[in-house]
């Protein structure tokens, strides 16, 4: 939402936000190697005109607010997480994972992003993760980066469907479907990758999740949910819902396929999708990377 509409629990929290805004340039220059991109948005109103034009105060402030909220408006906590996130993005290059890299088609078949502009608040953008399909590509988990770059890329594409200035579409919903998953196809490599992904999302994507549904989870696999809870904050875990029967998902939000108890198109592939194009600043950075690689 626009900067003047941000809601602070107290005047002290507002002052903490203003401090972070004022000290952000120094933080980025001194502790983040000048890297100022966050989820495709520019955090600083600096640089040549052709770069500075990508800055939006409202978007930058909305993102800073999320980091503060995730840390109970602790300045030190928010700064630590923000600095860590910007340095991770500078090194990992998640925008490239989302828009410039090709991923194994077996992985691509295990994840979908749907978008319904008429859906209830913050259920418009949904990422679907079909873990049962990963049993056919366990070989890909031996190199953890293969799966992690795919999974982060899916997350980043989903973020492009959000509108940080719209309180009804500033967070996403996630569905993790464990149909056809058994203890036999969750080997050590899969578990290690899962833990790394959970840690990445907890550390570097604060306040972007509205709700997460674990569906078709057999009792014998409840440990998966327990592992996830162990890696996330209590605030995040309160957004989790576990459903043994996937057809009950329709009771929580509309627009889901028949397999989940809804009346939408029969398959996830038929659900309406967002454009998922990179933001203007993300596109500029991607083109810059390509140009530098060619040089």
UniProtKB/Swiss-Prot annotation:
Binding site for heme: 131, 151, 176, 178, 212
Endoplasmic reticulum as UniProt keyword: yes
InterPro entries on file: CRAL-TRIO_dom, CRAL-TRIO_dom_sf, CRAL/TRIO_N_dom, CRAL/TRIO_N_dom_sf, Sfh5
Record key words, sorted: Cytoplasm, Endoplasmic reticulum, Heme, Iron, Lipid transport, Membrane, Metal-binding, Microsome, Transport
Keyword Endoplasmic reticulum included in the entry's annotation: yes
Family, per entry: Belongs to the SFH5 family.
GO cellular component: cortical endoplasmic reticulum; cytosol; endoplasmic reticulum membrane; plasma membrane
Residue ranges annotated for the CRAL-TRIO domain, each copy included: 100-268
Cellular compartment(s): Cytoplasm; Endoplasmic reticulum membrane; Microsome membrane
Lineage, uppermost ranks: Eukaryota, Fungi, Dikarya, Ascomycota, Saccharomycotina
Function: Non-classical phosphatidylinositol (PtdIns) transfer protein (PITP), which exhibits PtdIns-binding/transfer activity in the absence of detectable PtdCho-binding/transfer activity. Regulates PtdIns(4,5)P2 homeostasis at the plasma membrane. Heme-binding protein that may play a role in organic oxidant-induced stress responses.
One example GO MF annotation: heme binding
Pfam families: CRAL_TRIO, CRAL_TRIO_N
Topological category with respect to the lipid bilayer: Peripheral membrane protein
Cited PROSITE patterns: CRAL_TRIO
Chief place where the protein resides: cytoplasm
Reactions mediated catalytically: a 1,2-diacyl-sn-glycero-3-phospho-(1D-myo-inositol)(in) = a 1,2-diacyl-sn-glycero-3-phospho-(1D-myo-inositol)(out)
Name of the protein: Phosphatidylinositol transfer protein SFH5
Superkingdom: Eukaryota
GO biological process, one term: regulation of exocytosis
